[in-house]
C-alpha cells in the first residue's frame, strides 16, 4: 500500500503531467496557426507523451492499492512569441518537471517504498532525455536563426 504522503505526491504529479500535456497541445496549435506544422507536430506528440505519463502513474497507483484523485488542471498560457521562445519555455518546463519527479523519488526513499522509488526512477531517466532533447532544439534554433527555421520545422515534423 502506498502511504498517504506518497499518494498526494503522485496525484499532484498526475495533475502536473496532464497540465504539461495541455501546455504542449496549446503550443502545438499555436505553432500550427503560425504555419509551423513540423514544430506543431513535434509538440502534439510531446503532449501525447505527457498524457501517457499521467496514465502510467495512475495505473501504477491503482495497482498498488492507492486512490487516484484527478484534480482541476489550471489554464495553460497562450499567445506565444517566437519559435525559439516556445522551445525555451518547453526546456524550462522540463527542468521543473524533473525536480518534481526527483521529489517523489526522495519521498519514496524516506517512506521506504522501494517499488515506488523503482517505478519513478524510469521517469528520472526519461527526464534527463527530455531536458537534453529540448535543450538541443533550443541550441539548434539559436544556431540556425530565422533562415534555418524552415529546415528545422521540416526535421522536427518527422518525429514519430
PLM features: residue spans?
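Iron-associated oxidoreductase/ferritin-like identity signal
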Residues: 1-160
Amino acid at each position: 500500500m502506498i502511504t498517504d504522503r506518497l499518494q498526494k505526491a503522485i496525484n499532484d504529479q498526475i495533475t502536473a503531467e496532464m497540465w504539461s500535456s495541455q501546455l504542449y497541445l496549446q503550443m502545438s496549435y499555436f505553432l500550427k496557426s503560425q504555419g509551423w506544422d513540423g514544430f506543431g507536430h513535434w509538440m502534439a506528440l510531446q503532449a501525447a507523451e505527457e498524457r501517457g505519463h499521467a496514465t502510467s502513474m495512475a495505473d501504477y497507483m491503482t495497482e498498488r492499492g492507492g486512490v487516484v484523485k484527478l484534480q482541476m488542471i489550471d489554464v495553460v498560457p497562450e499567445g506565444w512569441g517566437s519559435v525559439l521562445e516556445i522551445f525555451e519555455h518547453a526546456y524550462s518546463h522540463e527542468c521543473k518537471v524533473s525536480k518534481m519527479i526527483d521529489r517523489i523519488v526522495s519521498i519514496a526513499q524516506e517512506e521506504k517504498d522501494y517499488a515506488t522509488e523503482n517505478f519513478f526512477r524510469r521517469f528520472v531517466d526519461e527526464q534527463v532525455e527530455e531536458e537534453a532533447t529540448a535543450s538541443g532544439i533550443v541550441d539548434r534554433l539559436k544556431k540556425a536563426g530565422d533562415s534555418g527555421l524552415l529546415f528545422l520545422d521540416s526535421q522536427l515534423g518527422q518525429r514519430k
